[in-house]
From Swiss-Prot:
The keyword Disulfide bond applies. The lineage of its organism: Eukaryota, Viridiplantae, Streptophyta, Embryophyta, Tracheophyta. The presence of a 'disulfide through disulfide knot' structurally defines this protein as a knottin. InterPro entries: Tryp_inh (IPR040875). This is Trypsin inhibitor 3. It comes from Spinacia oleracea (Spinach).
Amino acid sequence: EDKCSPSGAICSGFGPPEQCCSGACVPHPILRIFVCQ
């Protein structure tokens, strides 16, 4: 079962956008990670 990640959760910048509940995985402005918008 696929659970979407909430806003602010770390996500894969290369993964499907559906991994985030918002449908958007964006780069964090400070940390070198991607987070759900």
